[in-house]
């Protein structure tokens, strides 16, 4: 039996605020969403240092070693979407839209849109 795909309501490019952890209160833009792990990588938040070794690939130029600072993933439960100056929860609404077929005829369809729970507006 196929396993159900995990859903994450935060999308790449969203501005989020960290609500728990060592970077609580920090805001940043989502760089990457790791859906299977239910984690997000936020720009400038949860930065960690990685010590890397010089890798030489048989005479060719390899990677340089040293200490690299990069963002580490944060669980989605520890971030909230920033919208309209404050944080908000995310909801979903089904909107009815009219679509057009290649032959010119139209038909009704539904699409799912993200909404702000605080204002009710589409995100």
UniProtKB/Swiss-Prot annotation:
Pfam families with a match to the protein in the record: KOW (PF00467), ribosomal_L24 (PF17136)
Organism domain of life: Bacteria
Gene3D superfamilies membership: 2.30.30.30
CC per GO annotation: ribonucleoprotein complex; ribosome
SUPFAM superfamilies in the record: Translation proteins SH3-like domain
MF terms in GO: rRNA binding; structural constituent of ribosome
InterPro entries in the cross-refs: KOW, Rib_uL2_dom2, Ribosomal_uL24, Ribosomal_uL24_CS, Ribosomal_uL24_KOW, Translation_prot_SH3-like_sf
UniProt keyword RNA-binding, yes or no: yes
Keywords: Ribonucleoprotein, Ribosomal protein, RNA-binding, rRNA-binding
UniProt-listed GO biological process terms: translation
Annotated region (Disordered), positions in chain: 100-123
Alphabetized HAMAP family for the sequence: Ribosomal_uL24_B
UniProt similarity note: Belongs to the universal ribosomal protein uL24 family.
Subunit structure comment from the entry: Part of the 50S ribosomal subunit.
Function: One of two assembly initiator proteins, it binds directly to the 5'-end of the 23S rRNA, where it nucleates assembly of the 50S subunit.
Protein's UniProt name: Large ribosomal subunit protein uL24
């Amino acid at each position: 039996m196929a396993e159900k795909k995990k859903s994450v309501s935060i999308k790449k490019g969203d501005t989020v605020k960290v609500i728990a952890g060592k970077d609580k209160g920090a805001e940043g833009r989502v760089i990457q969403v790791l859906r299977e792990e239910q984690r997000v990588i936020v720009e400038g938040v949860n930065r960690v240092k990685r010590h890397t070794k010089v890798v030489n690939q048989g005479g060719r130029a390899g990677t340089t070693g040293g200490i690299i600072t990069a963002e580490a993933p944060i669980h989605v439960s520890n971030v909230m979407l920033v919208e309209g100056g404050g944080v908000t929860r995310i909801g979903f609404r089904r909107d009815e839209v009219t679509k057009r077929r290649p032959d010119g005829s139209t038909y009704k369809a539904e699409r799912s849109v993200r909404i702000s729970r605080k204002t009710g507006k589409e995100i």
